């Protein structure tokens, strides 16, 4: 009887670990920003279970070792599950992904930071020390630099092959891949995410998502970088 007990305890612990990991990875698909932007948490247990979390700083899913219990919902069994839950978080410049630093130890000033969860700029009181570059002098500067450029609404419509029986090559914008792809159009019905040629699709939907290549950085950021360069020289 005593020899059976350790086996049951082992099976029970494995069941609990599997349940915890399963629950953590069952996030619904879509823009789950509150879940995906949580920091990675391997939990207090000591198992080493290969899992995946969404990294706000690289804006991609990365592997980590889950301890097997507790932790948080930013925890997925597979890379595919992580991508499925978090792919809709739009890409923004690196400094806009940083968490705001509200420590106050110097001259107080009102500034704005980009909130990756809400994709908006919010006001905060900057203390002037240990701050990062996610801070802007006003809301307009913040939004102009950080807010993702949006394509027309119909670019986000799903692929629709239509209602008839023809077989015509058309192109649609795939928001998940952020690229234009070919599909077979049946000749009638469908939606506006339907282009006769690849060039029109790219011009309408892809270019609208890209930020200007030579976009100037806000003066505040340039000033901070010049100051850092001067300090290194002395």
Swiss-Prot record:
It is found in: Secreted. SMART domains: KU (SM00131). One of its GO terms (biological process) is blood coagulation. SUPFAM superfamilies: BPTI-like (SSF57362). Disulfide bonds join 36-86, 45-69, 61-82, 96-146, 105-129, 121-142, 155-205, 164-188, 180-201. GO terms for molecular function: serine-type endopeptidase inhibitor activity. Glycans are attached at residues 115, 167, 184. Residues 36-86, 96-146, 155-205 form the BPTI/Kunitz inhibitor domain. PANTHER family: KUNITZ-TYPE PROTEASE INHIBITOR-RELATED. May play a role in the regulation of plasmin-mediated matrix remodeling. Inhibits trypsin, plasmin, factor VIIa/tissue factor and weakly factor Xa. Has no effect on thrombin. This is Tissue factor pathway inhibitor 2. It comes from Bos taurus.
């Amino acid at each position: 009887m005593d020899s059976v007990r350790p086996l049951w305890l082992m099976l029970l612990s494995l069941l609990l670990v599997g349940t915890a990991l399963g629950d953590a990875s069952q996030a619904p698909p879509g823009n789950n920003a509150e879940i995906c932007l949580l920091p990675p948490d391997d939990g207090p247990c000591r198992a080493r279970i290969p899992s995946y979390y969404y990294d706000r700083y690289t804006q991609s899913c990365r592997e980590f070792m889950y301890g097997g219990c507790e932790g948080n919902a930013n925890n997925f069994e597979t890379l595919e599950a992580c991508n499925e839950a978090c792919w809709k978080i739009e890409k923004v410049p690196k400094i806009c992904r940083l968490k705001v630093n509200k420590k106050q130890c110097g001259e107080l000033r009102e500034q704005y930071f980009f909130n990756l969860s809400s994709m908006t700029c919010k006001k905060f009181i900057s203390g002037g020390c240990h701050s990062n570059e996610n801070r802007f002098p006003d809301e307009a500067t913040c939004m102009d630099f950080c807010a993702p450029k949006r394509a027309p609404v119909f670019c986000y419509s799903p692929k629709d092959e239509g209602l008839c029986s023809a077989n015509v090559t058309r192109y649609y914008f795939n928001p998940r891949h952020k690229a234009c792809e070919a599909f077979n159009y049946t000749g009638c019905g469908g939606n506006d995410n339907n282009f006769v040629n690849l060039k029109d699709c790219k011009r309408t939907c892809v270019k609208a998502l890209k930020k200007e290549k030579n976009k100037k950085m806000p003066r505040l950021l340039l000033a901070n970088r010049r100051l850092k360069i001067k300090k290194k020289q002395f």
